[in-house]
Amino acid sequence: MKSVNRRQSLRMLGAALLAGCLMTGGRAQTQGSDVKPVNKSSREKIAERHLPNVTLTTQDGRKVKFYDDLIKDKIVMLNFFYAKCDGICPGTTANLVKVQKLLGDHVGRDVFMYSITLKPEQDTPAVLKKYAEAYKVGPGWTFLTGDPKDIELLRQSLGFTNPDPALDAVKSQHIGMLRYGNEPRQWWAGCPGLAHASYIVKSFGWAVGLPKAGKEAGQ
């Protein structure tokens, strides 16, 4: 029962982080009108509000749609970063390499990892490819860049924000957290990117409905 409560609390946290601001389905018709309201599922609402289908480019130069190609029907883990970061980016990336190793062959099969640059003007696909190679990133982990406006839309839609406008404008404020989720089941949660790798794997597994990932990694 204790583990069930923990799982439920993680998913409730994810719902608050990602979907808590969703608007409820409103009435589309006015008095005297025969126009019927359009009822959308909660999954459609989350995708529409928090998972914009912008075009991004991978470290290999491949064009992809964020929702259609990277998120839909998948279990994912994602974070924001930038290559020339002297703060916590290097430590976070190195920690996620450990996470990837603990998850083993789940990555690229059941789980997909994404790191999105906050400085797309600097981080070209070639820069991202070199960065991934420097950290010996394995298959199933994709680095992404794109149009600055699309990156900013993603950042805000995914909830990597600060209520203080001055702090929100500082890119380094948005590189310390991970967001992970099971898109078809609408389970979302998150944790600090510098948390112990085994903790991330265990929390991730419970949150997205993949507890075997942590057990198989020896957690």
Name the predicted role of every residue range.
Residues K130-I175:
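Short, internal strand/loop/helix patches
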Residues K2-L17:
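N-terminal secretory signal peptides and thylakoid transit peptides that target proteins
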Residues A28-G32:
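Boundary at the C-terminal end of the N-terminal hydrophobic targeting segment
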Residues D110-D123, G140-K149:
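Thiol-based oxidoreductase modules, predominantly thioredoxin-like and allied folds used
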Residues T92-S115:
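Conserved helix-turn-beta segment immediately C-terminal to the redox Cys motif
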Residues F66-P90, L96:
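Short active-site neighborhood of thiol/selenol oxidoreductases, capturing the structured segment around
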Residues L167-Q219:
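Thiol-/selenol-based redox modules, centered on thioredoxin-like
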Residues D34-D68, G91-N95:
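N-terminal "domain-start" segment that seeds a small globular fold
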